[in-house]
Structures are given as C-alpha cells and as structure tokens.
Amino acid sequence: MTNTPSDQPLKQVNQRGAARLAAVQALYQMDVGGTGVLEIVAEYEEHRLGKELDGDTYLRADASWFRSIVAGVVRDQRKLDPLIGSALQDDWALSRLDSTVRAILRAGTFEILERKDVPVPVIVTEYVEIAKAFFQDEEPKLVNAVLDRIAKQVRGEQRK
C-alpha cells in the first residue's frame, strides 16, 4: 500500500530544510523553464519564502542558505554533474533522470562538496526526505545511494 502525502505524518521543518526544499523547486523550475538564477532567486525571495501564494503558505526558509544552494549549483554544475554521473549505475545517464531528481541530486552534491560544516548524515537525510515529498518508490532510494557514494568519494565517509 502506498501513502499519499496526506496520509504521511507532517514533520516540523527547520529553516534550512525549508531552504533546501525551495532550492530544489527553484532548480527544477530553472531546468524545465530556462529561468535565470537572478530571476528565480528574486521570485522566491519576494513571493515564496515564508509567503502566501495562491492560497498556499510557503515555509519560512533561511534565505541565505537558499541563495547559497541555488547559486552554488548553477556556478558548479560542470563539476557536480560528472560526480553525480559517476555515482549512478553504469547504464544510467544524468539526463535520463527526472528533472526533480536531478535538482535534488545537484543540491545534495553541492552541499556535500561545499558545506563541510554540515555532517553528511544530515545532508543525505534532508534530501532523501525531499525526494519522499515528491516520490514514493525508487527515487528516494536512488537519492540515498547516489549521495552516499558521492560522500564516500568526496569526504571519505558514508551516512551512518
């Protein structure tokens, strides 16, 4: 039996967690719609982070954390994508992945590389939870496995 999002218990989200979720959404929007980084960051800060939009209230998020992830992924994408590609199974290309999964993996990989002050288990868990918000089956497992492989390669550690 699969759970719909309304069947799952709500977890309290911290401001960094909300920033990560917003960053994944922004990266997805940039990937699919071709929106530029300055435009997307301004849109999220002015209309989404902690704001009400179309009857939905967005979570309060750490705006500087959000900006750091989005700008960092865009800046470092040529470094991130090969790392992600090498952590995928041999017969999978990054381009074959769903745009949301790509956004999650890019953001998680960026944090593993650049945010040495954040423990790997925190990063991996946060992005697996984001994957679970969008997918119910294999995608969260894929996110977990790929980010674990990248963490081991980059930091020499795995999620415990």
Swiss-Prot record:
One of the entry's Gene Ontology molecular-function terms is: RNA binding
Report the SS bond pairs: none
- Database matches in SUPFAM superfamilies: NusB-like
Q: Which GO terms describe its cellular component?
A: cytosol
Q: Does the keyword Iron-sulfur apply?
A: no
* Gene Ontology biological-process annotations: DNA-templated transcription termination; transcription antitermination
Q: From what superkingdom does this record's organism come?
A: Bacteria
Q: Does the keyword Transcription apply?
A: yes
Q: Which Gene3D superfamilies does the UniProt record give?
A: NusB-like
Task: Could you list this entry's UniProt keywords, alphabetically sorted.
Answer: RNA-binding, Transcription, Transcription antitermination, Transcription regulation
According to its UniProt entry, what is the function of this protein?
Involved in transcription antitermination. Required for transcription of ribosomal RNA (rRNA) genes. Binds specifically to the boxA antiterminator sequence of the ribosomal RNA (rrn) operons.
* Family that this chain belongs to: Belongs to the NusB family.
Q: Which HAMAP family match?
A: NusB (MF_00073)
Identification of the protein by name: Transcription antitermination protein NusB
Q: What is the scientific name of the source organism?
A: Sinorhizobium medicae (strain WSM419) (Ensifer medicae)
